Amino acid sequence: MNLITTIITITITLSAVLATISFWLPQISPDAEKLSPYECGFDPLGSARLPFSLRFFLIAILFLLFDLEIALLLPLPWGDQLDTPTLTLIWSTAVLALLTLGLIYEWTQGGLEWAE
């Protein structure tokens, strides 16, 4: 128990010291070089402060949603080894139906249209 306490104390102390140094170390007044964007040693082609399209974020969130669906359904073949494989089938069908209804809703609302 004493070893765990020592390791936790060292970890917290080291983290606090490094966090404090990271706030004190940089200069207070930033110059133009630090505020300019850097693109592999070349001058930037356009403004680096242009906002992204909201449609991009919507497509990205939908991709993550369906990627998570696949991650949840990958262990499904091992579900038939449970005591009640029909319950596993019912739950997986419910998840697929819910996500399919969500996709149909996004499609009908025009959320998947990239150009307006």
UniProtKB/Swiss-Prot annotation:
Entry keyword Flavoprotein: no
Alphabetical list of InterPro entries matching this protein: NADH_UbQ/plastoQ_OxRdtase_su3, NDAH_ubi_oxred_su3_sf
Membrane topology: Multi-pass membrane protein
A GO-annotated cellular component: NADH dehydrogenase complex
GO molecular function: NADH dehydrogenase (ubiquinone) activity
Pfam family, one: Oxidored_q4
Class of enzymatic activity (EC top level): translocase
Transmembrane segments: 3-23, 56-76, 87-107
Location of the protein in the cell: Mitochondrion membrane
RNA-binding found in the keyword field: no
Keywords tagged on the record: Electron transport, Membrane, Mitochondrion, NAD, Respiratory chain, Translocase, Transmembrane, Transmembrane helix, Transport, Ubiquinone
Domain of life: Eukaryota
Reaction(s) catalysed by this chain's protein: a ubiquinone + NADH + 5 H(+)(in) = a ubiquinol + NAD(+) + 4 H(+)(out)
Location, primary (coarse class): mitochondrion
EC number: 7.1.1.2
Function description: Core subunit of the mitochondrial membrane respiratory chain NADH dehydrogenase (Complex I) that is believed to belong to the minimal assembly required for catalysis. Complex I functions in the transfer of electrons from NADH to the respiratory chain. The immediate electron acceptor for the enzyme is believed to be ubiquinone.
Protein family membership: Belongs to the complex I subunit 3 family.
The protein's name in its UniProt record: NADH-ubiquinone oxidoreductase chain 3
Originating species: Oncorhynchus tshawytscha
Name of the gene encoding the protein in the UniProt record: MT-ND3
